[in-house]
A protein has these predicted regions:
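Terminal targeting segments of Actinobacterial cell-envelope proteins
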Residues: 1-19, 27, 277
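Short alpha-helical interface patches
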Residues: 13-24, 231-235, 269-270
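Signal peptide-directed extracytoplasmic domains
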Residues: 17-20, 25, 36-133
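Bacterial extracytoplasmic/cell-wall-associated proteins, especially those involved in peptidoglycan
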Residues: 88-281
C-alpha cells in the first residue's frame, strides 16, 4: 500500500454495499429488455411465470436462486446444472459465468430449463460485450474485455446512481495507475457473500483474492453481472483526478483527490449514521 493510502481504521474508500441488489423496483425498470430463449422439447413443469427479470448487479448466486424459484425447481438445481450447461464463456472466465449472466427480462414457458436460461443470458452478454466498440474501449483503458467487465461489475456495485458510474470507473483507473489498492468494500462483500455498508478492520485482513484492501489490481473475476450503463462507464470514464469517494447521504456522493477532504466527508457520513439518518448508498 502506498504511503498516500490511509490506514483502514482511518478511512473507507466507499461506504456503499449492495443492499440495493434486492430492491428490484427502479433497477428492474432499466433492465426490461425481452430476450428470446432456447427451450428443450419435451420438458414439462407446472405453469411458470411469464418472465424472469434479472436486475443489474445481481451476483451469479442470486441468479441461480431466481432461476430455481421461477422454474419451480429444488434449491441448487441451476447451480448443479452448470457443468453440463455448455455455456459459451470467454477463456478468461475459466468456466465461471459471473459477469456474463446479462441483466434483462427473459421470457419463460413450460419448456424453459436452467440451461436454456443461462445460455440466453451468456449469449446476450456476448452480443453486448464483444462488439468492436467494446474491444476498442477496452484497449483505450489498457484492458482486455474480461477485465473491462470486471471493472464494470465494481462500478455497478459501487455507484449510487448512473451519473456516478463514470466517476467511480475513473477512481478505479486512477488508483490502478498509481499502484494503490482499490480498497473497495464491494469486493470484500463478494468474498464474504454478503451485502453491507459496514466493513470492519477485521474484514480488511481477510485472506482472499477479492480483498482489494490487501491485494493489488483487479479481483480475479467480476463480482456481479453489470448492465450496459456500467460497461459504458468502464470503457469511457470521464477525465478526473479523483481517488476517493463516499456517499454521505442518498443522492450526495462526493468524489475527491484530497485525502483530507475525503476524511471530512467520511466523518460527515459517520455523523449521519450515528444520528440514525437515511442509509447512505
Amino acid at each position: 500500500m502506498q504511503k498516500n493510502t490511509p490506514s483502514r481504521n482511518t478511512i473507507r474508500l466507499t461506504r456503499r454495499g449492495r443492499l440495493a441488489l434486492i430492491v428490484a423496483g427502479a433497477v428492474v425498470a432499466g433492465t426490461a429488455v425481452a430476450v428470446p430463449l432456447l427451450t428443450v422439447e419435451g420438458s414439462h413443469r407446472a405453469t411458470a411465470p411469464a418472465t424472469l427479470v434479472i436486475p443489474e448487479g445481481w451476483r451469479a448466486a442470486q441468479v441461480y436462486d431466481a432461476v430455481d424459484k421461477a422454474l419451480h425447481l429444488a434449491p441448487g438445481t441451476t447451480r448443479r446444472s452448470l457443468p453440463q450447461a455448455g455455456l459459451k464463456l470467454p477463456n478468461d472466465a475459466g468456466g465461471n459465468p459471473e459477469g456474463y449472466l446479462f441483466p434483462a427480462t427473459y421470457p419463460l414457458d413450460a419448456r424453459t430449463t436452467p440451461r436454456s436460461l443461462l445460455s440466453a443470458m451468456v449469449e446476450t452478454a456476448d452480443r453486448r460485450f464483444n462488439g468492436a466498440p467494446v474491444a476498442a474501449g477496452a484497449r483505450r483503458t489498457a484492458l482486455n474485455v474480461y477485465q473491462a467487465v470486471t471493472v464494470a461489475s465494481i462500478v455497478q456495485a459501487e455507484a449510487a446512481t448512473k451519473d456516478d458510474m463514470g466517476k467511480v470507473a475513473r477512481v478505479v483507473f486512477n488508483r490502478l495507475a498509481r499502484g494503490m489498492p482499490l480498497q473497495m468494500d464491494s469486493t470484500l462483500n463478494y468474498a464474504l457473500n454478503r451485502s453491507t455498508l459496514r466493513t470492519t478492520e477485521k474484514d480488511t485482513r481477510l485472506d482472499s483474492p477479492y480483498n482489494s484492501y490487501r491485494r493489488m489490481g483487479l479481483p480475479p473475476t467480476p463480482i456481479d453481472n453489470p448492465g450496459e450503463e456500467a460497461m459504458r462507464a468502464a470503457l469511457d470514464p470521464p477525465a478526473g483526478n479523483w481517488l476517493y469517494f463516499v456517499t454521505v447521504r442518498p443522492g450526495d456522493t462526493r468524489f475527491t483527490a484530497s485525502l483530507e477532504e475525503h476524511e471530512r466527508n467520511v466523518a460527515e457520513f459517520n455523523r449521519n449514521q450515528q444520528r440514525g439518518g437515511p442509509t447512505a448508498r
